[in-house]
Amino acid sequence: MASISTPFPISLHPKTVRSKPLKFRVLTRPIKASGSETPDLTVATRTGSKDLPIRNIPGNYGLPIVGPIKDRWDYFYDQGAEEFFKSRIRKYNSTVYRVNMPPGAFIAENPQVVALLDGKSFPVLFDVDKVEKKDLFTGTYMPSTELTGGYRILSYLDPSEPKHEKLKNLLFFLLKSSRNRIFPEFQATYSELFDSLEKELSLKGKADFGGSSDGTAFNFLARAFYGTNPADTKLKADAPGLITKWVLFNLHPLLSIGLPRVIEEPLIHTFSLPPALVKSDYQRLYEFFLESAGEILVEADKLGISREEATHNLLFATCFNTWGGMKILFPNMVKRIGRAGHQVHNRLAEEIRSVIKSNGGELTMGAIEKMELTKSVVYECLRFEPPVTAQYGRAKKDLVIESHDAAFKVKAGEMLYGYQPLATRDPKIFDRADEFVPERFVGEEGEKLLRHVLWSNGPETETPTVGNKQCAGKDFVVLVARLFVIEIFRRYDSFDIEVGTSPLGSSVNFSSLRKASF
């Protein structure tokens, strides 16, 4: 398939890591098993050269209905996601095992998966030669297409499907066409955000980052991608509320919203919520994108995509993928950097301000590339707490999948699942894997670890193409995350936070913001 180069003029990745030019998104090539006893199988992943013993996949699915419900209760209520997986790793002495994934009965037809919970087995989920991605974006169930205008959106398409290439190229065009607006619009919108947070902090003694940030993120995306200020349209400031409600209707089987189990289980985990309840909200969003995306819709015409289908895909990519990702990522970044302490804050502030000063007071892509600690901190945030925790793929053929300690036979048609935080905090790959280490990716040795940063549905050292499922906006997300850190430490020497929980990401309040003193 054809590929397209990154829409950004300067690579976001160290040159020492990649020898080939940027394309976009990850592909791992199939390696044939050399053992004569398994000539019909493909080795899904292989690191090192030692022969690993073939082991039966441990675990079980329990009784129909009862087993999936028990696993769902463990996942949401009795253990929580991380302990759910870790306890079974201890039980089976294996990072590969069989388990049921939510939502199970009665929303998902088949909740049974083979879980891949280490950094060696996990990457098979990116290899579209080995796994199919059709209708697996949300896992073992797919929300009704009534929530997306009757269309299967790009995120649910396998690269083998004809529309995948056209729709992904449309997103590449969107990114390319917006590149000159990203820097000025980010600085304008996030300067307004921090001005308002300072006022709130002075009045109340603390400032809620999440609520204010949601509106800022949408304003930035609308202005950067489409050249439209939502305040000047019928949408006004309503987008975050409309999107949050719509996302809830898409993802409610996978969320816990803090209600008692006896209420939450029948309400959001047992049956799908009726799409009709958000139809009018979605229509308001659709009309905004239809009216704002003129240049992009002209490109859709050229690609042979109807304007209606293109608009639904632009809405999903902007609101679900990008805004939703920023809603999770930015509060998590504030949390992790806040907890790193004032010494780290001072180092970031010194690096950012000195680089900008030496660049004549101007922030450019070239200047950002010189901010080694800033870049490392962003990658560490993405490693430690990836905004997307789950990846799914259905085996296209019989496979042998290797963990660090054993190899496992998987049959064609079996569902594979990976919980990304365990893969990117694999202690056999990362030293101090469960610690946030700001300088982890600084220097040549640090750069070599970037291939194990997997948040984008592929290694950080790879790039998206129309032939894979790596996030089309991977480089965009890394860029805006860097801009976010830069904006904070251009303005402040340090800050303090209070952290709570949220169904999507973290709830963060600023308890202090110390303005720049040098």
UniProtKB/Swiss-Prot annotation:
Q: Where is this chain's protein located in or outside the cell?
A: Plastid, Chloroplast, Plastoglobule
Reactions this protein catalyses:
(13S)-hydroperoxy-(9Z,11E,15Z)-octadecatrienoate = (9Z,13S,15Z)-12,13-epoxyoctadeca-9,11,15-trienoate + H2O; (13S)-hydroperoxy-(9Z,11E)-octadecadienoate = (9Z,13S)-12,13-epoxyoctadeca-9,11-dienoate + H2O
Q: What does this protein do?
A: Cytochrome P450 enzyme involved in the biosynthesis of oxylipin jasmonates, important phytohormones acting as growth regulators and signaling molecules for plant defense. Functions as an allene oxide synthase that converts hydroperoxy fatty acids to unstable allene epoxides. Catalyzes the dehydration of 13-HPOTE ((13S)-hydroperoxy-(9Z,11E,15Z)-octadecatrienoate), as well as 13-HPODE ((13S)-hydroperoxy-(9Z,11E)-octadecadienoate).
The UniProt entry, under InterPro entries, shows:
Cyt_P450, Cyt_P450_sf
Documented effect of changing F137L: Impairs allene oxide synthase (AOS) activity, but confers some hydroperoxide lyase (HPL) activity. Confers strong hydroperoxide lyase (HPL) activity
The first-level EC class reads: lyase
| The name this protein goes by in its record | Allene oxide synthase, chloroplastic
Question: Which family is this protein grouped under?
Answer: Belongs to the cytochrome P450 family.
Superkingdom of origin? Eukaryota
One of the GO BP terms on file: response to jasmonic acid
Protein's organism? Arabidopsis thaliana (Mouse-ear cress)
Residues reported to bind heme b: K133, H164, K168, K469, C471
Q: Which Pfam families match?
A: p450
Q: Cite the annotated pathway.
A: Lipid metabolism; oxylipin biosynthesis
